[in-house]
C-alpha cells in the first residue's frame, strides 16, 4: 500500500505546478501535462518517490540519525515547526543564515548564547539587572529564539535535511552539497531535481500539499524511532491562501549571522 494515495494528493492539490512559462526543463520527466497554462505533476511518480523517501527516512531514523526540516516561506513555516517537533527533529522556518551548516562552529556560539539567555530569564536573573540592560537582553533573546529556536538542541550538523521549496532555499541546498548531507526535497515544476538526493515532485505553494507531504515524512521519522505511528492527532489549521505566491528572491539572499543587539536585515 502506498504511503500516500492518489486521491489524497489530488484532494490536497499536490498535482498543481507553476505556470508553464516558469518551468525548469529538468522537471519534464515528472510533468504529466499542462492545463490552462499550468503544468500538472505526474502523481504516479510522486507516489513512488514518496514511498522511496518514506522508507529512506524511516531507515535513517532507526539508525538514530538526526534530521533538519527547512521551510521559510509563510505557507510552510507553521507546518515545519509543528511536524519537526512532533517527530523530534530540528527546524529552520524563519530565515536561513549564511553558514548555518558550513560555519556551524560560529552558529553554535549563538545557540549557546540563546540557551544562556533563556536560563537567565527563567531563573529571574534578568529581573535583577537595570531596566535598560534587561530590555536589551530580552530583545536579543527574542531575536535568537526567532531565528535559532528550532535548532536549540542541535549539537552537530544534521545527517539528513528535508526542504520545502528547493529553489527558495538554495543557500541551504548549497551548504548541504558542500558537506555531502543528503537532501529530501519537495520540488515544484520550477525546481532542479539534479541538486537533491530524493526529489518529491509536488506543489510547494499550497498549504494542504505541504502539510500532506511534510506530515508523511515526519511520520517516517516517528515510526523509525518508535516502531509504530502514534494515534492520529488533530493538526492546527494554518491560515493563508493556497494560491501560487510570488516572492522577491533577493529578499532571501545570504543573511549575516545576527550579532548581540544587531537586527538581521
Swiss-Prot record:
GO terms for biological process: translation. NCBIfam families: rpsB_bact. This is Small ribosomal subunit protein uS2. It comes from Nostoc sp. (strain PCC 7120 / SAG 25.82 / UTEX 2576). CDD domains: RPS2. The keyword Membrane does not apply. Keywords: Ribonucleoprotein, Ribosomal protein. Belongs to the universal ribosomal protein uS2 family. GO terms for molecular function: structural constituent of ribosome. Residues 231-265 are annotated as: Disordered. GO terms for cellular component: cytosolic small ribosomal subunit.
Amino acid at each position: 500500500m502506498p504511503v500516500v494515495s492518489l486521491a489524497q494528493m489530488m484532494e490536497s492539490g499536490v498535482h498543481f505546478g507553476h505556470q508553464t512559462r516558469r518551468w525548469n526543463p529538468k522537471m519534464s520527466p515528472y510533468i504529466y501535462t499542462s492545463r490552462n497554462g499550468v503544468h500538472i505533476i505526474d502523481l504516479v511518480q510522486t507516489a513512488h518517490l514518496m514511498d522511496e523517501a518514506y522508507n529512506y527516512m524511516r531507515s535513517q531514523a532507526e539508525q538514530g540519525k538526526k534530521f533538519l526540516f527547512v521551510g521559510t516561506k509563510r505557507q510552510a513555516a507553521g507546518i515545519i515547526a509543528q511536524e519537526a517537533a512532533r517527530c523530534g527533529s530540528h527546524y529552520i522556518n524563519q530565515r536561513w543564515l549564511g553558514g548555518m551548516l558550513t560555519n556551524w562552529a560560529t552558529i553554535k556560539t549563538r545557540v549557546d548564547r540563546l540557551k544562556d539567555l533563556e536560563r537567565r530569564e527563567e531563573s529571574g536573573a534578568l529581573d535583577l539587572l537595570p531596566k535598560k540592560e534587561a530590555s536589551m537582553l530580552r530583545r536579543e533573546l527574542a531575536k535568537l529564539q526567532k531565528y535559532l529556536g528550532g535548532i536549540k538542541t542541535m549539537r552537530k550538523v544534521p545527517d539528513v535535511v528535508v526542504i520545502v521549496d528547493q529553489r527558495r532555499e538554495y543557500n541551504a541546498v548549497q551548504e548541504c552539497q558542500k558537506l555531502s548531507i543528503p537532501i529530501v526535497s519537495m520540488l515544484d515544476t520550477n525546481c532542479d531535481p539534479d541538486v537533491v538526493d530524493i526529489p518529491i515532485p509536488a506543489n510547494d505553494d499550497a498549504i494542504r500539499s505541504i502539510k500532506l507531504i511534510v506530515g508523511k515524512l515526519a511520520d517516517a521519522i516517528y515510526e523509525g524511532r518508535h516502531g509504530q505511528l502514534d494515534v492520529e492527532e488533530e493538526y492546527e489549521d494554518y491560515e493563508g491562501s493556497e494560491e501560487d505566491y510570488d516572492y522577491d528572491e533577493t529578499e532571501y539572499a545570504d543573511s549575516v549571522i545576527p550579532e548581540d543587539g544587531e537586527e538581521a536585515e
